[in-house]
Amino acid sequence: EYCRETPATRRPHQAQGHEMEMSLIMAKLSHEAGASWILSRSGYSGIQKYAQTWTGDNNSSWKSLQYDNTILASMGLSGLIHAGCDIGGFWGETPDSELLLRWIQNGVFTPRFCIHSYKDIPTEPDLHEVTHPKHFKSIQKFMQLRTELIPYLEEQSKLASEQGIPIMRPTVYDFQDEPETYNQSFEYIFGDKFFIAPIYQPECTSREFYLPGKGITWTHYFTKEEYQGGQQISLDIGLEDIPVFTRD
């Protein structure tokens, strides 16, 4: 862990974890009908066939919020279709209300939604009304939205398992004929339906990005305004929502 040293062959910790994951999923499948889901802290080449993992011990910062999306999209391309991150950050300072709100808003549209922290950092959902009263109603709204998206996530999970299409993926995956998507590091596609342009800077009042999909009509999920794909757009941003677009 933490890449402090290169392990010797007599200490193949990651390979051991891989064998444990494989054994566990085989045992579950032999005793239980239906889908099985395993979360593992360690992994090795081929883990995507048996278990899922997360981005690791991130810190409570805007930079972590920004780059977790890049990591998750890359993990999706590697077959880890249910990857997630510790929303709010695992270690470091307690996230302020705006950072936690933005992280939750973004996390709703990731495969694995988990608010998790270390020791005395109070980010647990049952504490938000006390620890983050300023944005509690907005946090509550997005937590409810995540619940409403469960059927969609189940559908996309099945599709990803059967066809290998990542749930969370870079925009270039879907729009390879549009050069503007080649350098889109932070915007991403979430399943068949959503395009997400997350907010990863404090006190953000506007967001400019390329909306892919020439010939596609996108609908802003919250304002219901329609936009044509294949163009650069700029939106005014408030604290109540983030740029999320849907297509039919």
Positions of the model-derived regions?
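Catalytic-domain carbohydrate-binding cleft regions of carbohydrate-active enzymes
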Residues: E1-I242, T246-R247
